[in-house]
UniProtKB/Swiss-Prot annotation:
Its main location: virion. Plays a critical role in cytoplasmic virus egress. Participates in the final step of tegumentation and envelope acquisition within the host cytoplasm by directly interacting with the capsid. Upon virion binding to target cell, a signaling cascade is triggered to disrupt the interaction with the capsid, thereby preparing capsid uncoating. One of its GO terms (cellular component) is host cell cytoplasm. Keywords: Host cytoplasm, Host nucleus, Late protein, Virion, Virion tegument. The keyword tRNA processing does not apply. This is Cytoplasmic envelopment protein 2. It is found in: Virion tegument; Host cytoplasm; Host nucleus.
């Protein structure tokens, strides 16, 4: 995949070739906004090497060469080499950065760089790139294949471990629905979720770790074996710099009941042991109705999102005390989104993501 470039990338040819001011600014914006978290690959007194992965966006696509690996055609792997050469006399907090994409093409610049820890996650960092100045590539360019991503620091994440108490937006209606009880706040630029209290996990089937409402409803209301679309949704390991990860309900906030996602159905029968519905309601239910997404609002009230009925068709009150509103931090929210093609299309439609996910359904 290669998009037609709508602006020139370079100011010259040959050894003096470097990015134009417009291109290097776009590159900085892409590294800051469109990548996942950054994993430290190597740190020594001379150079710091970091790596990040995400789905390719229109902002980053002009810097990516034509890909021959059809298994990861929409994925970008960025490796950065950070140094402070004495002969450049760089200002404080400014570094020389070589950026490599997909182990094939590199660019050089200086930039004001801020690297900061991400709350509750070890070995990965957030990063911002500002005030870039393009430079020609040095004669000797490092090979990122010589510095593989450490295999022992790549756990399968459970997003429930990273939930934070919410700081509510002033306008709860300025949001996009990702799945029932999961929202992107346009105002706060972060994800908000309804999640059950940890003590309710004991009421769930063995091996169940999902606490976020969309994932719980997916388990309760989707067909047991899943459909091809559900089972083969592609995710990038944007939290740990992995080009791909195994699908699992705890690893992304995109999970939702299959027929709600694909067909816009809002009234769905429980597909598992109805006893498991007691994590949501004060008694067992056989049918759950999901609120319309046409006028969404971030809410801490479970009853604003779902309603349930029993086998006799009578309403069953929700278990509101067992569910709380949480949020993810801004940096982590952006990484979660950049690792999921569906979330990219919902949260950042203005960037016209390239992951090939279908358009979300409004119900």
């Amino acid at each position: 995949m290669e998009l037609q470039r709508i602006f020139p990338l370079y100011t010259a040819t040959g050894a003096a070739r470097k990015l134009t001011p417009e291109a290097v600014q776009r590159l900085c914006d892409a590294l800051t906004l469109d990548m996942g978290l950054w994993k430290s690959i190597l740190t020594d007194p001379r150079v710091k090497i970091m790596r990040s992965t995400a789905f390719i966006t229109l902002r980053i696509a002009p810097f990516i060469p034509l890909q021959t690996d059809t298994t990861n055609i929409a994925v970008v792997v960025a490796t950065i080499y950070i140094t402070r050469p004495r002969q450049m006399n760089l200002p404080p907090k400014t570094f020389h950065v070589i950026v490599n994409f997909n182990y094939e093409v590199s660019y050089a610049m200086t930039a004001t760089l801020r690297i900061y820890p991400v709350e509750n996650i070890d070995h990965v960092f957030g990063a911002t790139f500002k005030n870039p100045i393009a430079y020609p590539l040095p004669t000797s360019i490092p090979d990122p294949r010589a510095d593989p991503t450490p295999a022992d620091l790549t756990p399968t994440p459970n997003l429930s471990n990273y939930l934070q108490p919410p700081r509510l937006p002033k306008n709860p209606y300025a949001c996009k629905v990702i799945s029932p009880g999961v929202w992107w706040s346009d105002e706060r630029r972060r994800l908000y979720v309804l999640a059950m209290e940890p003590n309710l996990i004991g009421l769930c089937p063995a091996g169940w770790h999902a606490r976020i409402l969309g994932s719980v409803l997916n388990r309760l209301l989707s067909h047991a074996d899943g459909c091809d679309e559900c089972n083969h949704r592609v995710h990038v390991g944007a939290l740990y710099a992995l080009p791909h990860v195994t699908n699992h309900a705890e690893g992304c906030v995109c999970w939702a009941p299959c027929m709600w996602r694909k067909a816009g159905q809002r009234e769905l029968k429980v597909e598992v042991d109805i006893g498991a519905t007691q994590v949501l309601f004060v008694d067992v239910t056989t049918c759950i109705r999901i609120t319309s997404t046409k006028n969404p609002r971030i809410t801490a009230n479970l009853g604003d999102v779902i309603a349930g009925t029993n086998a006799s068709g009578l309403s069953v009150p929700v278990n509101s005390s067992g569910w709380q509103l949480y949020m993810f931090g801004e940096t982590l929210s952006r990484a979660i989104i950049n690792g999921c093609g569906l979330l990219q299309r919902i949260c950042f439609p203005e960037t016209q993501r390239l992951s090939g996910e279908p358009e979300p359904t409004t119900t």
